Amino acid sequence: MTADNGWLGLNLAREEDWGLLNPWLQQDGDLSEWGHVEDALLGRDAKALVARGRLMGLPVSFLPRKVIAESTGVSEILGGAPVFEFTSDAQATLRHFNTAQSMSDLKVVDLSALWAGPLCAHLLHQCGMQVTTVTSSHRPDGAAQGSPTLYKVLHRGHNHLELDFSSQEDLRRLADLLHNADVVIEGSRPRALRALDLDRDSLLPGGKQLWLSLTAYGRRAPFGDWVGFGDDVALAGGLFCQNKEGTPEFIGDAVADPLSGIFAALAIVKLVQRDASGLLDLSLFAVASHCRKKIHSSGGTMSDEYHRPNLRC
């Protein structure tokens, strides 16, 4: 959506985010439809709106006009970041897996939702690992309703465990499950599991386990508190296409999600082969930014007009 000094990527997939629009834009009036929101953004300072929106927990991103004009692919976060950061517990040693049976001994616990984390878990399951998907009884995975076919495919063959995160008994069950896992996949902001004493440092300080933290913008402050989804984060990373009028548009369908799921699975398999343990910090933003740079460095372009797919699966 167009603003004064660039474009905004705004994702309102969660019903509660619609209720934040009036205080975010600091105005009264009907903002119950996308057209009303677009009108309200005209002439507004996009960068200031993004800063306020992120403090409020809105999934919003900013694309400066200079990125379009210069076609540089420069992201909104200067300096760039590696695709992922891995904090190892010890010196890794190479471990060879010659058959799927070798990986079948590995237990994966997937705490993530939507697309990127579940895709990673699905690919690890395809490699032979045992996957247990944990869901909240009070906050079910939105993909189960929004994309039921994709949800069934990504979770096929997994063990499923539904827990009440307000129950101390269920939290103890989850702690035991995480403690005995070889690989943990989680997609929440760092403070969420830390508040429940279910983060890696609380459960297994220095323990021999591989833990994937899959976030929108990474774990470091202040990025670790920012909310984001595949479309708006891809825009922030410079991964977008342009229509015939030169206006930026999203690529594909939440493209940062499947890309990040694939990157995460490849990284985990590589680290598992080295018998490595530690925390793998991977963000949708870094993956999108990396892919943008790869496309440009190879002489490719992203100028085709966007056509939304009918099905994700």
What residue ranges belong to the model's regions?
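Acyl-CoA thioester-binding alpha/beta core of soluble enzymes
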Residues: 1-140, 168-171, 175, 179-183, ...
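Glycine-rich phosphate-binding loop and adjoining beta1-alpha1-beta2 segment
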Residues: 134-161
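Adenosine-nucleotide cofactor-binding segment
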Residues: 156, 160-174
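Glycine/threonine-rich flexible loop motifs
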Residues: 171, 188-200, 222
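Glycine-rich, charge-decorated loop segments at or immediately adjacent to ligand/cofactor-binding or catalytic sites
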Residues: 220-226
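Flexible glycine/proline-rich, aromatic-decorated loop/lid segments
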Residues: 226-243
